[in-house]
From Swiss-Prot:
Biased composition (Polar residues): 55-65
Region annotated Disordered, chain positions: 52-72
InterPro entries: SlyX
Name the record gives this protein: Protein SlyX
Similarity comment: Belongs to the SlyX family.
Annotated transmembrane regions: none
Highest taxon in the source lineage: Bacteria
Pfam family, one: SlyX
Amino acid sequence: MQDLSFEARLAELESRLAFQEITIEELNVTVTAHEMEMAKLRDHLRLLTEKLKASQPSNIASQAEETPPPHY
């Protein structure tokens, strides 16, 4: 009787381990896909930022071009 309980427990643990391995592999695939998508989005964001900076000159004058405040 003790052996059946031990065998049943062992089979249950092996089953759980198999399901955990499958779940870990699925999560790994998902994380890898998300990392690749994030890398693409970072590249797009960098390109858009560069285009925006190139297309719009800054409206803020440099400190050398600024007139001093009236209390000087």
